[in-house]
Amino acid sequence: MAFAASTACCKPSALLAPRASSSSPPSQARLCRPSTSAAFHGLRAPASAFALAPAPRRRAASTGIVCGKVSKGSVPPNFTLKDQDGKTVSLSKFKGKPVVLYFYPADETPGCTKQACAFRDSYEKYKKAGAEVIGISGDDAASHKAFAKKYRLPFTLLSDEGNKVRKEWGVPSDLFGTLPGRQTYVLDKKGVVQYIYNNQFQPEKHIGETLKIIQNL
């Protein structure tokens, strides 16, 4: 009798019969599919950037200290770029004074505008500490000039078209590599990196974090 019951429970029809379901669950691809574009601090990434993309390496919630090719305690490579007035500027020009060098995604985007204006509003505190503030993005000199004029930015903006310096310094990207990272470096008078701060979601925090370091150098 036990054998008969076991055989009855293992009938092929019972194994192959599909379960009744009022609705089939959505596939993983559908769950991961965004709308036609995704806005992030004013920049847009195509939907294809998200479709079944592999998970990125985790960082500390895109905030805090993140080190790439340029690390704390190192002397970063020199570079020469054009500023908002079309003049060539080299990093070595600022040796002998502390420097706050911040990489940002793009001019005229919400997060970057907030960050630039926050640096502007605290600029006198940086100057009092003897420091220079320099912003770098992939925008051209004309874009920087318009951006600086519109928001009355008193500091230097450098054009890193092609992102050569960004790559050399190892500035990490966000949003599956589609969004340039927001990372700030504090260099002392000797050109040595004393602090690296990364925070894409809270651009204004870069000012408070770097001021604390500058005022104690």
From Swiss-Prot:
The active site is at C112 (cysteine sulfenic acid (-soh) intermediate). One of its GO terms (molecular function) is thioredoxin peroxidase activity. SUPFAM superfamilies: Thioredoxin-like (SSF52833). Pfam families: AhpC-TSA. PROSITE patterns: THIOREDOXIN_2. Disulfide bonds join C112-C117. It catalyses: a hydroperoxide + [thioredoxin]-dithiol = an alcohol + [thioredoxin]-disulfide + H2O. GO terms for biological process: cell redox homeostasis; cellular response to oxidative stress. Residues 1-66 form a transit peptide. GO terms for cellular component: chloroplast thylakoid lumen; chloroplast thylakoid membrane; cytoplasm. It is an enzyme of class 1 (oxidoreductase). It is found in: Plastid, Chloroplast thylakoid lumen. It comes from the Eukaryota. Residues 70-217 form the Thioredoxin domain. Keywords: Antioxidant, Chloroplast, Disulfide bond, Oxidoreductase, Peroxidase, Plastid, Redox-active center, Thylakoid, Transit peptide. Its EC number is 1.11.1.24. CDD domains: PRX_BCP. Its main location: plastid. Thiol-specific peroxidase that catalyzes the reduction of hydrogen peroxide and organic hydroperoxides to water and alcohols, respectively. Plays a role in cell protection against oxidative stress by detoxifying peroxides. The active site is a conserved redox-active cysteine residue, the peroxidatic cysteine (C(P)), which makes the nucleophilic attack on the peroxide substrate. The peroxide oxidizes the C(P)-SH to cysteine sulfenic acid (C(P)-SOH), which then reacts with another cysteine residue, the resolving cysteine (C(R)), to form a disulfide bridge. The disulfide is subsequently reduced by an appropriate electron donor to complete the catalytic cycle. In this atypical 2-Cys peroxiredoxin, C(R) is present in the same subunit to form an intramolecular disulfide. Belongs to the peroxiredoxin family. BCP/PrxQ subfamily. Monomer. This is Peroxiredoxin Q, chloroplastic. The lineage of its organism: Eukaryota, Viridiplantae, Streptophyta, Embryophyta, Tracheophyta.
